[in-house]
C-alpha cells in the first residue's frame, strides 16, 4: 500500500515515513535509515523522521551519526516551532554526551 502511494507521489512524507517505520520494525535498519533520509531530503521540516532516524542509529551503535541527525532535527524544530520535539531531541543529545 505505501509503495503504491510512493509510486504516485515519491515526496509523500507520511507514506515514506511509514515505510521507514515498517522497515525499522522488521529490523531492516539500512532500509529504514535510507527511507528516513529520503523523507527529510524531500521534506526537510518533517521532524519525526529526524528523531526516529536518530533512535535507529543509536540502536545500531552509530552515535556520531545519531548526533548529526538530532542536530538537523533540532534545526527543523526551530524552523517549525515544534518545541515539544525539540525538548525530546535535546534530551537525546544530552544522553549521548
Show which residues each predicted segment covers.
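Canonical positions in the second alpha-helix
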Residues: 4-5, 38-39, 73
